[in-house]
Amino acid sequence: MKIALVGATGMVGHVMLEVLAERKLPITELLLVASKRSIGKEISFEGKILKVIGLETAVAAKPNIALFSAGGDISLEWAPKFAAVGTTIIDNSSAWRMDPSKKLIVPEINGNELTSEDKIIANPNCSTIQMVMALAPLHKVYKIKRIIISTYQSITGTGVKAVEQLNNEAQGKKGVMAYPYPIHKNAIPHCDVFLENDYTKEEMKLVHETHKILGDDTMGITATAIRIPVVGGHSEAVNIEFGNPFEISDIRKLLHNTPGVVVQDNPETNTYPMPIYAEGKDDVFIGRIRRDTSHPNAVNLWIVADNLRKGAATNTVQIAEYLIANVL
């Protein structure tokens, strides 16, 4: 299987290389693709030194699958060019997510929707992926009516410049500013750009992508997204109102039996998910599971995951695995 990684020199691209090596995909040839300024750069993969190539060269090589993590503009321009030579694209940007002709995939939830006709497949936003991993099994049984979300998001979701800003500020140095304010010892309620409705783009991604993945746009969803000075992963406080009655013990059991989910929930031993322990792992961790005392048919969850792995690289590679095993 010939696979191209577009955006191989970026933060997510680096993690994707790690995940590809860990999960042992049947790769006969790996093409590392990046912008012109990175062409010729050498990157190690499984003991071999590979040279970065340009987009034109990669298209000419006609890979079976192209994993895109190079931003929306690159995806909009180049994904159709790869598709035209028979390549199946899995795109990690927001470029194709809400296109009604493209599927938005979390393999554990809706991977079975994929067919050989799907040449451009969208990977959801990081904060959406970890949340729907919890919501999907609950929605099937209890029918979700409304969701209230507050996210506490890692600076790695912004990129290398944000990590550099935090490190500089922690050391008292001046330097690049990825955010309009200091991030060290701060919380910024501003993820992505503000929209006309005064929500941020990140907040509305949670709304629209959740509707699409779960196949139900009747549920009410509102979100507040906050950037905090951590690097291990995203955390979410999620309040879920159901249409059907439930028992907390059944909620715990259902989540415990969900593939890709790890329940960490024992107040007596101070056991609950935290990004410092989620970092580097592919599971979605759920804890603080409790009935909403203000509403008889609602539950509160605390959901944590590594945004660069399950929130990006791992989910992308899992889609590729599904395609290789069932479609291509």
Report each predicted region and the residues it spans.
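N-terminal Rossmann-like NAD(P) cofactor-binding subdomain of oxidoreductases
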Residues: M1-I183, T218-G220, V284-F285, I289-H295, ...
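Charged docking surfaces used in two-component/phosphorelay signaling
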Residues: A66, I155-L328
